[in-house]
Amino acid sequence: RATIKKGDITTANMISVHPYGNYLCSCYATGAEILDALEHSVANTQAVAAQDGKAVGESGGFLQVSGLKFTIDTSIPSSVKKDDKGLFVDVEGERKVKDVYVEKNGEWEPIDPEATYTVACHNYMLQDMGDGYTMFADNQYILDNVMLDNQVIITYICDFLGGNVGEEYSAPQGRITII
């Protein structure tokens, strides 16, 4: 994958960032499934910061979220259990992910493990268990293979941002705190 430098963004830039041909999907998920996904996402995250400011241990499977905020406590060893193929099985022990909040009507409220939420992502993670995300594979899908992930971002930039990505997108939004 590539990164996008400051300046004009082209369709080729977007395709180089999202080159895999994944499709947007949306499903219903319980708060417990979301908590498991977050825990799986941060299993290898360590406190030591790399030169680019990201925590050591992040991978392509590290979830970038919207509508959620949470803290990763790197002093806690991962208790994520995976099978011999690297697929998520369970969390057996204390969780590294703490203080998970869901945005609802412009307010933040603690996630409810029993509640049902709507999750949007690409089919690779949600349906195909990519990067080991097994928790959503059998869920009920609201939207299935809507459009290519790079096309979703192109549409958002063109149709909702008027083709201008503002300064607010250049800095972290504070949704993920690493301690």
Region annotations inferred by a language model:
Residues 1-179:
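Catalytic centers of hydrolytic enzymes
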